[in-house]
């Protein structure tokens, strides 16, 4: 039986117990704030980062995983006899995928495959979880690679943002539009589309925001064989509604805390759902 190692980056935002359970190798991105650099999740979590951002009124930057770190990781597992499936955040949002490709080319090994998820946070997470499930089922290296690539267009998402301040600071939303949105109580519903964050809807109030996200997770559209991920950035309003809906529909789901890279843009009080649709 093939030894297969699943590798990803820290933007997958999977809980530590899941990472340990499936022995996933997670390479953290760097978070740069106040002249210091931290490994995402390892050295700093979102709650700590959020506190710094609020108190200092600053916005952090992030750095991709370097080719050398991928090279060291791949070389280690190849030496141990593994074949490696590396699934990374969207190439349109970070150079991390390209770093992994450079590392693969340096090693000149056919036993390493690098996949662009065209997603981020729990959208990347659901693909990593599927790869782990397929491995547990005894699927081959080639079968897992092909199934993950086939699944990528079928990952769906909806994220509700309570405040727009961090989107403004991060340049994802104009200052004028964001300020007006905050004043009017407008909630942005975003989705990951074609590898980038896109506005799905604009509504006023938490109830309408919850309704838009709920419409995305209708029972008939979701593949219940796959695990749905419920992403939380300290949200106490919409998240319980989404959780209850998934329980009622008997969906398998895992709750995940947002990491620093995505959380820097979402801010607190955001939440979202990521799943694989039927196809």
UniProtKB/Swiss-Prot annotation:
Residue ranges of every copy of the DegV domain listed in the record: 4-277
Annotated hexadecanoate binding sites: 62, 94
Pfam family, one: DegV
Record keywords: Lipid-binding
Glycoprotein listed as a keyword: no
Domain of life per record: Bacteria
GO terms of molecular function: lipid binding
Keyword Transport: no
The protein's role, per its UniProt record: May bind long-chain fatty acids, such as palmitate, and may play a role in lipid transport or fatty acid metabolism.
PANTHER family found in the cross-reference section: DEGV DOMAIN-CONTAINING PROTEIN DR_1986-RELATED, FATTY ACID-BINDING PROTEIN TM_1468
Protein name, as recorded: DegV domain-containing protein CA_C0701
């Amino acid at each position: 039986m093939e030894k297969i190692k699943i590798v990803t980056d820290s933007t997958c935002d999977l809980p530590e117990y899941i990472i340990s359970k499936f022995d996933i190798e997670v390479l953290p991105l760097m978070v740069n704030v106040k002249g210091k650099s931290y490994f995402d999740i390892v050295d700093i979590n979102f709650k700590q980062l959020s506190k710094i951002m609020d108190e200092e009124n600053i916005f952090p930057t992030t750095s991709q995983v370097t080719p050398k770190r991928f090279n060291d990781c791949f070389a280690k597992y190849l030496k141990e006899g593994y074949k490696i499936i590396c699934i990374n955040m969207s190439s349109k949002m970070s150079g991390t995928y390209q770093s992994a490709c450079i590392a693969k080319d340096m090693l000149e090994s056919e036993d390493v495959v690098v996949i662009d998820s065209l997603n981020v946070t729990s959208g990347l997470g659901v693909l990593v979880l599927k790869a782990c499930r397929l491995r547990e089922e005894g699927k081959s290296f080639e079968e897992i690679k092909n199934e993950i690539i086939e699944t990528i267009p079928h990952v769906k998402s909806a994220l509700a943002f309570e405040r727009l301040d961090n989107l403004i600071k991060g340049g994802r939303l104009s200052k004028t539009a964001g300020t007006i949105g905050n004043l009017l109580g407008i909630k942005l519903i975003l989705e990951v589309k074609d590898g980038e964050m896109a506005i799905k809807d604009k509504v006023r109030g938490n109830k309408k925001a919850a309704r838009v996200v709920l419409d995305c997770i209708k029972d008939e559209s979701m593949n219940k064989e796959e695990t749905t991920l419920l992403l939380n950035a300290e949200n106490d309003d919409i998240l319980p509604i989404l959780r209850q809906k998934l329980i009622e529909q008997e969906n398998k789901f895992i709750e995940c805390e947002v990491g620093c890279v995505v959380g820097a843009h979402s801010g607190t009080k955001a939440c979202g759902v990521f799943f694989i649709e039927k196809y």
